[in-house]
Amino acid sequence: KGKNFKWKLLQNSPNTINAILSEKKLIKKWVSEYDLSGIISDNRLGVYSKKVPSVFITHQIRVMSGKTTWISSKIHQKLIKKYTECWVPDVEGFPNLSGKLGHVKKFNGNLKYIGVLSRLEKEIVPELYDLMVIISGPEPQRTLLEEKLIIELNDFSKPVLFVRGVIESEQIITRSDNIVFYNFMTSEELQKAFNYSNKILCRSGYTTVMDLAKLEKKAFFIPTPGQFEQEYLAKMYHEVNIVPTASQDDFVISDLKQIDSFRGLPKFKNEINWKQLFALFKGK
């Protein structure tokens, strides 16, 4: 599975290079056309300019790719150094959320750790669901996990909210015994759903991890097979007794009992000095 993922990355590399070149061409035009004061790139490697301060946002200073991690990381770091600053959505010290992904010993780039970022807010509301299942990621793995979990949940009697992660023209809500199914949710609905739920069963993508930390929710992770970043994060949290995990093939519903014996994600007080951060663009 890991080999298949790397092969797909290799196949997509011409598309990635073309995308970077297209972004650079567009940015060059925009800088002069709109008199830009600066650029903030959310993980887009072609979105920068030498003429104005340019910031790259990423939690991956080290890019996990199995045996080729060292070279994928070096390439990524070289591209990051083209930017004036790199903002990492994590804390610099320990404990942190990104582990080796966002923390490297030797890097000459201008890194700034800006704290854990999430658009969601913790709410004090009644608990409506014992378990929230939220599925995401590429096909066919999304469908394979959905089908597996529906079977496993036959042995789960408590209230469940199941978000399938399928974006369609209309929202569809169905009910089956103790489970409420949504094909997708808006950001506002997701915030309420997370807050209404006792525990979360989901992938271990970094955005989801930050959301769970912000909401102080306990979880169980099933990383997307072959996605090295998710597999690394899930393994790291499991080994330090923060969040339990299982592979997609091995997971059984009784594994959820482990959640209570794990500490849960650390709490962070985010005190981002936005004025200080954006001073980079002042007078440009």
Give short role names for the model-derived ranges.
Residues 1-15, 180:
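Conserved nucleotide-sugar phosphate-binding/catalytic loop shared by glycosyltransferases and other
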Residues 11-16, 242-284:
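Leloir-type glycosyltransferase catalytic cores
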Residues 23-87:
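Conserved nucleotide-sugar donor-interacting segment of glycosyltransferase catalytic cores
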Residues 26, 75, 188-192, 208, ...:
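Short acidic active-site motifs
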Residues 58, 63-140, 164-168:
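A nucleotide-sugar donor-handling region in carbohydrate enzymes
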Residues 101, 115-199, 209, 231, ...:
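Donor-nucleotide binding loops and adjacent catalytic segments primarily
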Residues 199-200, 218:
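Hydrophobic acceptor-binding patch used for acceptor engagement in glycosyltransferases
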Residues 208-209, 213-263:
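Catalytic binding pocket for nucleotide-activated donors in carbohydrate/polymer assembly enzymes
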